[in-house]
Amino acid sequence: MGNEVRVRYAPSPTGHLHIGNARTALFNYLFARNQGGKFIIRVEDTDKKRNIEGGEQSQLNYLKWLGIDWDESVDVGGEYGPYRQSERNDIYKVYYEELLEKGLAYKCYCTEEELEKEREEQIARGEMPRYSGKHRDLTQEEQEKFIAEGRKPSIRFRVPEGKVIAFNDIVKGEISFESDGIGDFVIVKKDGTPTYNFAVAIDDYLMKMTHVLRGEDHISNTPKQIMIYQAFGWDIPQFGHMTLIVNESRKKLSKRDESIIQFIEQYKELGYLPEALFNFIGLLGWSPVGEEELFTKEQFIEIFDVNRLSKSPALFDMHKLKWVNNQYVKKLDLDQVVELTLPHLQKAGKVGTELSAEEQEWVRKLISLYHEQLSYGAEIVELTDLFFTDEIEYNQEAKAVLEEEQVPEVLSTFAAKLEELEEFTPDNIKASIKAVQKETGHKGKKLFMPIRVAVTGQTHGPELPQSIELIGKETAIQRLKNI
């Protein structure tokens, strides 16, 4: 094995890019770039029943959108291809035939029914289900009998007895398995397709992978892959198994959990920024030295240390993601924020697709009001709802404000001041509020809060004069008089 670090992300084209898979890709990418090595994408598409049309391209597109690039893959080629497992069957055949020849693998003619019966009997005896090995040493005559019955064989790896398979995991430390607890496992299915563990071991060796960084759900696969390496006398790559991502209930993130958005495509559609997602995912199970939490891609590459991968589960905190994204939104100029948010207002039917110069100016002012507090693009629809509705609803907090004794005087006086305005500008609106203060003697919260609640329906919000300007003179006066 050479000195150059070579790592891979190996997606199956069975669906869209999940946040967990994006993290696996990102950590491998950062490790390769930090070490001046190579990052490879290999498509594991042998499970044809689960593959979906466009799944492969979708994975690649959203990795690119996040800001991840690669050195070798189906789209850019490379000297260790093909990079789709479905195109490597002739390669796998050479290696499983070698194992058969050496007696390190054998043909198994057991039917699914026989295997199921064996499993049930083992469970009934309180044993861990595993293949008994009853076809380990079939005679030629026995094999011919099964063939005559029309049985098709799978090929099983002959697991050595009484061995300890140990490896030093980058994240977890020393891990070991007893070979007697594993059982002879299938390396080629009855239809001639290699199984995951066999194909992965062959590919990782031939593509010269030095490290294999993946989720901890792969730990149980590792001893099988190591035994395949050992059977061929190959150097074994260094393994690192990243901890699970958990939700706020500390349960493993499940694709069925609808309380958390889990696919990169959905975040893009909602108007999250790729740089912010890159930053957030980069801290899911990895921590830098110090307290800083915001890093550019270049900074991540510089500081990434694979030995700082967390040993405890990574908490997916939606509030934290919104905070991180907000920090990036704040850095955008107004044109960029308009580009991020306007399509969401249009999709929601709040504004038209063809805007006059006057309408464009109004929308820009509206979006500018919420620039600092905006967490993601689509949030603009919810934040600005009060500007697009005839009837505003008041929550309990707002109702409590409107029940204070000074409210009728403040609101009626302010309505009269607004009616007098010829130019409805923030400066003139601000002057009108000051005039109400002077005339009624009410100031501070007693003055501002009833006006804000009456006109916006909210107890908190952006600059009041600017908000009232955008609501419009007629609507603002109507809302004041409706209380």
Curated annotation (Swiss-Prot):
Keyword Isomerase in annotation: no
Species of provenance: Bacillus subtilis (strain 168)
One biological process term in Gene Ontology: glutamyl-tRNA aminoacylation
UniProt keyword ATP-binding present: yes
Motif ('HIGH' region): 11-21
Pfam families reported for this sequence: Anticodon_2, tRNA-synt_1c
Cofactor: Zn(2+)
Residues binding ATP: K255
PANTHER family linked to this entry: GLUTAMATE--TRNA LIGASE (PTHR43311), GLUTAMATE--TRNA LIGASE, MITOCHONDRIAL-RELATED (PTHR43311:SF2)
HAMAP family for this protein: Glu_tRNA_synth_type1
Subunit: Monomer.
Protein name: Glutamate--tRNA ligase
Subcellular location: Cytoplasm
UniProt keyword list: Aminoacyl-tRNA synthetase, ATP-binding, Cytoplasm, Ligase, Metal-binding, Nucleotide-binding, Protein biosynthesis, Zinc
Motif 'KMSKS' region in this chain: 252-256
Residue numbers binding Zn(2+): C108, C110, H135, D137
Membrane spanning residue stretches: none
UniProt-recorded Gene Ontology molecular function terms: ATP binding; glutamate-tRNA ligase activity; tRNA binding; zinc ion binding
Enzyme Commission number: 6.1.1.17
Cofactor note: Binds 1 zinc ion per subunit.
Catalytic reaction annotation: tRNA(Glu) + L-glutamate + ATP = L-glutamyl-tRNA(Glu) + AMP + diphosphate
Alphabetized PROSITE patterns for the sequence: AA_TRNA_LIGASE_I
NCBIfam families: gltX_bact
Stated family: Belongs to the class-I aminoacyl-tRNA synthetase family. Glutamate--tRNA ligase type 1 subfamily.
